Regions:
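Extracytoplasmic copper-binding redox domains, predominantly the cupredoxin/blue-copper superfamily
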Residues: 1-141
Length: 141
């Protein structure tokens, strides 16, 4: 995955996720750094300079996945007939699962509702395992 810096200030992209830890060190505007994820799973990605910069990467081991359209609809094509567990994830909602049976006809409708009412921002530690310095009111981004 490539992490491009198009901002007029430096970044330091890192993750302390168990099986996919990495640190791209500090890099400036116009630079791009890359990382190859070794294991499937959720990777929380942060910037060691900007505590509110957060990204989530779902590393998948198979080909049966998708990202929904802006209206929430999604399609996963070319699924062989059989029984499957659909897993739906969003950073602000608990994961939702549905058992799905795909027939030879293919098309299956599934309704999924995510509930983000319990979401709370939780501060994370920097790449050294320490709190970020308090700069409230001094941010320039």
């Amino acid at each position: 995955m490539r992490f491009a810096n198009r901002d007029p200030f430096d970044h330091n992209v890192f993750s302390a996720s168990d099986s996919n830890q990495f640190d791209l060190e500090r890099y400036g505007r116009g630079e791009t750094r890359a990382h190859t994820f070794a294991h499937p799973g959720l990777v929380r990605v942060f910037c060691n300079i900007h505590p509110r910069m957060v990204a989530f990467v779902q590393v998948m081991s198979g080909r049966l996945f998708t990202q929904p359209a802006s209206d929430g609809s999604f399609v996963i094509s070319d699924i062989p007939p059989g029984a499957y567990t659909l897993r739906v994830w969003h950073e602000r909602s608990p994961e939702v699962t549905r058992d799905v049976r795909v027939t030879a006809a293919g098309a299956v409708g599934v309704d999924v509702e995510l509930d983000a009412r319990g979401f709370r921002w939780v501060p994370h530690k920097n790449k050294y395992g320490e709190d970020y310095p308090t700069n409230e009111g001094l941010e320039r981004y």
